[in-house]
Amino acid sequence: MDVVPLPLLLGSLAVSAAVWYLVYFLRGGSGGDAARKRRPLPPGPRGWPVLGNLPQLGDKPHHTMCALARQYGPLFRLRFGCAEVVVAASAPVAAQFLRGHDANFSNRPPNSGAEHVAYNYQDLVFAPYGARWRALRKLCALHLFSAKALDDLRAVREGEVALMVRNLARQQAASVALGQEANVCATNTLARATIGHRVFAVDGGEGAREFKEMVVELMQLAGVFNVGDFVPALRWLDPQGVVAKMKRLHRRYDNMMNGFINERKAGAQPDGVAAGEHGNDLLSVLLARMQEEQKLDGDGEKITETDIKALLLNLFTAGTDTTSSTVEWALAELIRHPDVLKEAQHELDTVVGRGRLVSESDLPRLPYLTAVIKETFRLHPSTPLSLPREAAEECEVDGYRIPKGATLLVNVWAIARDPTQWPDPLQYQPSRFLPGRMHADVDVKGADFGLIPFGAGRRICAGLSWGLRMVTLMTATLVHGFDWTLANGATPDKLNMEEAYGLTLQRAVPLMVQPVPRLLPSAYGV
């Protein structure tokens, strides 16, 4: 994806710089008596004219912000164009924001992605906090993410994972892109729950590759700090070409969502649902509510087709690639650490045996596998920087003044590598989470701010429970079902572990592996 590098924009901004400084000082940017009596703003680096600190972020902003935290402390301030940005880079500071001031930071700041991709804020992820947002979240919880819904859909998850494993067992002599295989599984599983049927063949095919490319492109675009969002005078220029790419990508997604809806309207039925009956999948429920003109929230707002498309877009993007990329990172780490892989396989053999695949009922009896998942989330959080939040009112955090309208970013990646919280933070050591160890009671569900891959507070990921079950079941089944060798004779010590930054944390080089079945043939159903 070609995005214009920020430093190349500076030559055309010289005049703007002079104007910006003039306006700044005319407005009293140097402060007055009242300002001097208030709490100080958090410290931070000096920025460029007009663009502020945007050019200093580099191609991996979470790395840059981690380094800045070492220099300025766990709470520091940046300026993105006209926007004040505060970054939380430690568990105690994150807790003050996301627990102590959660209500004040319950909204998102305006951004191009929400406008041009997410149906102008009509989705769940970027919708303003309020009755409509709560109603959308309740719908998802009731039909997908509640304990009852998760239990009802257990057979769907286990069935799709079994199909993935069967397909891999047939390819044991071939090199496979593990992330792609995991993405097909995650997408088909979610599709059966949301629209009632698979969207890809089990072996993926061209459609699956195209869809993954679309999701990766969306996450890359969403991870770009778009100059137009922070310098309003330059918005119309779209100097990085980000908005134009977003609009093109939105049209592709919109065609996809329209296809799902039109197919259902034309009478196509979900798997296992008789003609003329509504299915229990989310799309059936939403279309029924729309046709019956049921109210979406207490304000009398009714659900629209655009609402449905926006919600499906959230689910098919946030709920697929995050899962598959985490599974890919987990297997990469296990291949690099064969002793950890063998320990996990020994536990699985003891609990499950070699005559069947893992089921979800096995997972609570697999403490070492659970530790592997937690350690993978720690080193490779799917969202390294939290989605931004906005201060509704001025507040005080850690002795500093946080101005009204400031954007909050939580560096999830840096917090999970904080040496004051995690001994040997750069080492992959699942044993740190085992019973009797220092982090035995840490979970990933938002209560322990040292490990928040799904976020925390009222804007925590709505699909946390689904995502955690999928990542754990997929990883457990792959570890149990196969021994793994790297493709093309590569050795584990040479495995590329570089990151490719986006809104989600991708591998720079896809993991190419050869699966070698290790269970009884009957376990695979082949």
Swiss-Prot record:
Enzyme class label: oxidoreductase
Membrane topology according to the record: Single-pass membrane protein
GO CC list: membrane
Transmembrane domains' residue ranges: 6-26
Superkingdom classification of source: Eukaryota
Example GO biological process: flavonoid biosynthetic process
Keyword annotations of the record: Flavonoid biosynthesis, Heme, Iron, Membrane, Metal-binding, Monooxygenase, NADP, Oxidoreductase, Transmembrane, Transmembrane helix
Keyword Signal on entry: no
EC number: 1.14.14.82
Cofactor(s) this protein cannot do without: heme
Induction: Induced by light.
Catalyzed reactions: a 3'-unsubstituted flavone + reduced [NADPH--hemoprotein reductase] + O2 = a 3'-hydroxyflavone + oxidized [NADPH--hemoprotein reductase] + H2O + H(+)
Entry keyword annotation includes Repeat: no
GO molecular function: flavonoid 3'-monooxygenase activity; heme binding; iron ion binding
Binding residues for heme: C461
Pathway listed: Secondary metabolite biosynthesis; flavonoid biosynthesis
Pfam families per record: p450
Compartment(s) where it occurs, according to its Swiss-Prot or TrEMBL record: Membrane
Function: Catalyzes the 3'-hydroxylation of the flavonoid B-ring to the 3',4'-hydroxylated state. Catalyzes the 3'-hydroxylation of apigenin to generate luteolin.
PANTHER family in alphabetical order: CYTOCHROME P450 98A9, FLAVONOID 3'-MONOOXYGENASE
Protein name: Flavonoid 3'-monooxygenase CYP75B3
